[in-house]
Amino acid sequence: MHQNLVLTWQLSEIHGWGLVGLHTALYLLDQERPPLLADLPLLSAMRPANRARIEPLLEAHHRIAAIAQQAGDKILRLEGATVLQALGNGFIPGAAARFQGSRTVGVIAFENTAFDAAVRERARVYDRIVVHSTYNRDLLAEQGFTGVGLAFQGVDPEELAPVPPTGRFGNRFVVFSGGKIEFRKGQDIVLAAFRRFRERRPDALLVTAWHNYWPSSSAGIAESPHTPAPPAIGENGRLRIVEWAMAHGVPPDAFIDMGILGREQIAAILADCHAAVFPNRCEGATNLVAMEAMACGVPVILSANTGHLDLIREGNCLPLRRQSPVPDPDGSRRGWGESSVEELVEHLDRLYTDRAAARRCAEEGRAFVRGERTWRAFARSFVEAVE
């Protein structure tokens, strides 16, 4: 008999962890196994249909929250339950570490590859570990961890149903880049490549969704060989992305900052794009934004490193194979890759000049993601991996 599952992080539709929790909960509800939510779900950040399905879980959440409040800082052991804990780099748990079950499973997508004795000790307290990339699983195997579960994240095909282009960007060749600004995401590489590409193709337009809910974490991008400084933080607490792009030689008429995109906006924006670029230095999972672009039928350029390798198939994207090592003085960046600006420019030019080949690539990518990388498939394999 299956144990009850307890999700200890916040469900939402605004970031990866929230989506992992939400789609796991929806799957469990379909299996008539409602999960216990230890954290209050962010219902305001859910589409109405999903909100309606999650709301009935609030009653049990409020009961466990009241018990937790009465217990103060004590460990809460939930007998007969499997507790899933979301872990950060270094296997650092959040406040939910106080919830433990008959089985406690650690869920992680990590980019920091340094494993000292303290990290290994924290990892060993879990009855099982589940990751979201072959890259992470292999790194754990090197450290002696066996039986690590693997579940690939995905997309919701209904949410990303094909929509016709609106023509909002006119006759421009539109390049999309998404993901919060930080060193490992490689927005500096995007700017360097786009600046050169636009010199060849003056009708090119870079459309970005780079805002970072934790703007101070963007400071590390100053380590880049392509940029002298990170974007400034404005008085409103948001990154001054347009100014940063201008400082890198991208003219105002070739750059649009879309701000923070809502889930309902993604498909419509991507319908007007001709390419999506992801020269990321590292992905602990498989890059949700890249999969969304593929699902919407946009030809995608992907760095061939870390978690991206689980997305790359023959013909379904244009991989950036020229990968150089990223400086790694302390062993925290094993497997990270520095993409070639020149190769990225070449791939963009190929998509520009051969639209038929671009369409074939887009269709291969769309078929792959919609067939093999859905949230439904993720949730099924995730629950199996947990149990």
Predicted features and spans:
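Nucleotide-activated donor-binding/catalytic signature segment of Leloir-type glycosyltransferases, i.e.
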Residues: A219-E264
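Acidic donor-binding loop of glycosyltransferase active sites
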Residues: A268-A285, V298
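Conserved donor-binding/catalytic core segment of Leloir-type glycosyltransferases
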Residues: V6, R168-K185, L191-R198, L206-W210
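Short hydrophobic beta-strand element within catalytic cores of glycosyltransferases
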Residues: P299-L302, N316-P319
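Donor nucleotide-sugar binding/catalytic pocket of nucleotide-sugar-dependent glycosyltransferases
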Residues: D127-D138, F145-P162
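Extended catalytic core of nucleotide-activated donor transferases of GT-like folds
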Residues: V6-T8, R47-A141
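A charged, aromatic-enriched C-terminal amphipathic alpha-helix characteristic of glycosyltransferases
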Residues: S339, E343-L344, Y352-E384
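Acidic anion/phosphate-binding donor-loop and adjacent secondary structure
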Residues: A117-A118, V155-R172
